[in-house]
Amino acid sequence: MVRITKVHTGGGDSGETSLVDGSRVPKSDARIEVVGTCDEVNALFGLVLMESNRLSDTHSDGGNRVTTRRVKDVCNSAIGRLQSELFDLGAELACPPDQIPEYMQLIDQKDSDRLCDEMDAWNEELQPLESFILPSGSGPIAAMHLARTVIRRLERSMVAMKDGMRPISLQYVNRLS
């Protein structure tokens, strides 16, 4: 486990920051934008978790309790795992091009495939869509819509950055969006 003993260094006061290998880049560097957007998605997933756990087990109209519990269960298992994967992805993206340390935990094809399998399974539980869904709904749903739009921004930023990125990382974010 990583132990952080100091949360400030002053090293970024001049507008630069460090990559994983210790090399310095401007905070305006495309790689730093990508890492920051990945971090933003992770924070939004934390908001989704918080909002889902605030849901009552019953609806004000006496509606289906199973649905609310299912949302909580899915959020706590799937989103918790996604947060860990996004943390790993952010670390990978904070490496200089083609300089990923051997010890680093990386997103792989099984992670990308699992996303598709989970989405297919969840989709089977839903009624077919007849149109696009407007971003609204309960707290966790609205937060998930916001996370989805930031994931799409992350994907666009990754495509714009290009250099040294593993194709599976881009595929994973595309599937996540």
Predicted ranges, named:
Residues 1-177:
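Phosphate/pyrophosphate-binding loop motifs in nucleotide- or prenyl diphosphate-using proteins
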